[in-house]
Amino acid sequence: MPGLCVGGSPAATILKGKSIDLCKEGLSSQLRMATHATMRVPSVVTAVAMNTSLSEEIAHTTARLVVEEGLEWGPAKRRALREMGLPARTSLPDNDQVEEAVREYIQIFCADTQPRELRALRQLALVWMERMAPFRPHLGGAVWRGTATRLSDVYLQLFCDDPKSAEIALIDHHVDYDPRTVTGFHGEPVEALSIGSKSPELNEIIGVHLLIYDLDDLRGALKPDSKGRTRRGDLAAVRRLLEEKTDP
């Protein structure tokens, strides 16, 4: 009888016993490869689930820091990594994920106080938008999105023909301000004029930041985000928010 797995030659017949062993080894190797491939799929799924779970945990820690300490999202994400003992190069949750976590945190822990605080901040924003009306002010950030608390600052984006005109207006009205540089909505450095302004409703000094943009930037600023939401609102839009008590 010819040997298995080798062929029908006399040599194969002589090596019959060995050829059977080789066949067994070949089948065993194929089984091991198939088993490894089968086991690898759940491993990949598990890894993805773990990464998703970690990202959610980072987002919830970030949300707590944003709401309870008034941190901006970028610094809050980095602080969350340190608090969790994670490497600085750990993948961070995106802003949509953080915003969802912030809304959830507010709903659970701040539902009784946050709406009043948000309204007070929007009223303060409206005051400064009316004062800076010649410079086409738009409200952005947490106060516009509806996730602000009393620890949040107000961010107004001005679109000016002359980048120095808004600063001159503050000087003419004897308003103290601190010039600084912040990150703009395209990731570029933008000049900002920071003011401390008292909110009568909160009885606190709130940071109001006037970000100076060129008039040509206004068209791009009005484009909605990937979910169709408006990123910022003009004077009329903020007035409607205060009248309707709804979020954008």
Q: For each predicted feature, which ranges?
A:
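Cationic, low-complexity basic patches in intrinsically disordered or flexible, solvent-exposed regions
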Residues: S19, L31
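Ser/Thr/Pro/Gly-rich low-complexity, intrinsically disordered segments
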Residues: M1-P2, A11, I20
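Catalytic core of pol beta-like nucleotidyltransferases
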Residues: V48-G70, K77-R150, C160-P248
